[in-house]
Amino acid sequence: MAFAVIRACSRVGRGGLYKRLGGPPRGTRRQRQRPRQGRQGASRSIAEQRSAAPRPPTGPPARYPSPAASARASEARRHPAADLDPPPGEPQAVASRGTPEPRPPPESPGAPPPPGSAPADGAMAAAKPGELMGICSSYQAVMPHFVCLTDEFPQPVRPAKLPKGKGRLRRPRQSRFKTQPVTFDEIQEVEEEGVSPMEEEKAKKSFLQSLECLRRSTQSLSLQREPLGSCKLRNSLDSSDSDSAL
């Protein structure tokens, strides 16, 4: 290790590979302090050191390559054609040599298929259902519109809506008697059957109650109208009095 460091220092020099020497090199003070007799030898040694040391580059400073780029470059030096991905039909040896193998011409639609393609197609057709099932299960969350999902996961059917209007069942007569108008058939039916004394008493009582409610409502309305009329009359009298007083 020490020999390697000494050898590198002798090649590069004390100043370094890319370090510019701005002033005089080190050790000049000691050389100045020496007698004049040794100045000539010192100047010669300095000149030799300057001539031996490599000059720094005058251009822009060199950029150190990234570790990823250096790794790629080393791999490319080891394998010159390693970055060339071989096509699926070509062997690995041809791709490593870098000479592409001549491909066969495209087949015409009417040409008969090669003999080895029929069993391969049959094997692929036999392996398709399982592969499709696996594809459907793996793409269930990614591609919900996939074709297989319609068979495996059918969509729920909406319940049929209840019919409206004429199609609905009519309520019984007792519950709809007060809300819907009575038909002539129902009146005739009641007249034919006759009315029991209990029902007649109930009808009379309900009729009297309705009359009493009507009387009370009219009385309250008349009582409310009287103060309103008096207020209007008073206002008119006040206005007339004020006019007459003027």
Curated annotation (Swiss-Prot):
Residues 54-64, 101-117 have a biased composition (Pro residues). Keywords: Cytoplasm, Phosphoprotein. The modification Phosphothreonine is found at T179. The keyword NAD does not apply. Residues 9-125, 155-203 are annotated as: Disordered. It comes from the Eukaryota. It is found in: Cytoplasm. Its main location: cytoplasm. The modification Phosphoserine is found at S196, S210, S220. PANTHER family: CHROMOSOME 11 OPEN READING FRAME 96, SI:CH1073-281M9.1. This is Uncharacterized protein C11orf96 homolog. It comes from Mus musculus.
